[in-house]
Amino acid sequence: MFSLIFLILIGVTAVCDAQELVLHLSFDELNGKVAKDISEFGNDATFKGNPKLIEGVFGKALEFDGKTSGQIPDHASLDIVEAITIEFWAIVGGGEAIQSGVEKGTAWISGLYNLAALYNGGTILQFFDLPDGCNDENIGPSIQDGEWHFLAGTWDGDDILLYIDGKLEADMPCKGELKPNNDPLFIGARGGSGRFLTGALDEIKVYNYALTKDELLKDMAEPVSLRVDAQEKLTTVWARLKAN
């Protein structure tokens, strides 16, 4: 019995310590109202409302009608405390003044991290546990224009960086320490009950470390298989989006 507990503890520690992709929702298919996580951790998202697949940047994407949201149960892989990257492609239309993208927590509590697709006229990556100025002042430009944009935020333990379409748009020194919480991770709404997204999301990814700009550009170009020729791939992606 002791050996089994010891092995479980080792496994949990490994999940927390290794640099990993801990969530990847491609939205290429739905099984009922469940979107499969294609990372190794199986953090599948269950949606309520009217989840609908549409044409995305890569394959299919999930449309959000201002009433739809997804929920992923708490898991050790999502209790990120040392560094993080959250990224997704998003279309943001009308609707609420604050529209959630990916948020761990049901309310503004310890352990919450949030990459908001729309935040008071802009975009933001925020954390409850970091110093006050880091929570709501590092706001990037708005992407509320009905077009696809690649939004990514990183925190490496010292600085929050916010990228839009591969360009660094906001940065702020934010040294601190995150704490885990036991809440689910929500997609497209805070706690599944407010700040609903009106638009669409594609290729949601969460890493438990901070990606470099070059690594983000590779994800933009080809999110499943990262390749060296990222700039060439990006040119093709933007040409296809403009053609549509």
Indicate where each model-derived feature is located.
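Classical eukaryotic N-terminal signal peptides for Sec-dependent ER targeting/secretion
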Residues: 1-3
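Beta-strand-rich interaction surfaces with strong enrichment in secreted/lumenal proteins
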Residues: 73-76, 138-142, 174-175
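Flexible glycan-contacting loops in extracellular carbohydrate-active proteins
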Residues: 172-200
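Extracellular glycan-recognition modules
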Residues: 22, 26, 31, 35, ...
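Extracytoplasmic low-complexity segments
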Residues: 5-67, 217-244
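Short strand-turn-strand beta-turns centered on an Asx-Gly dipeptide
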Residues: 163-169
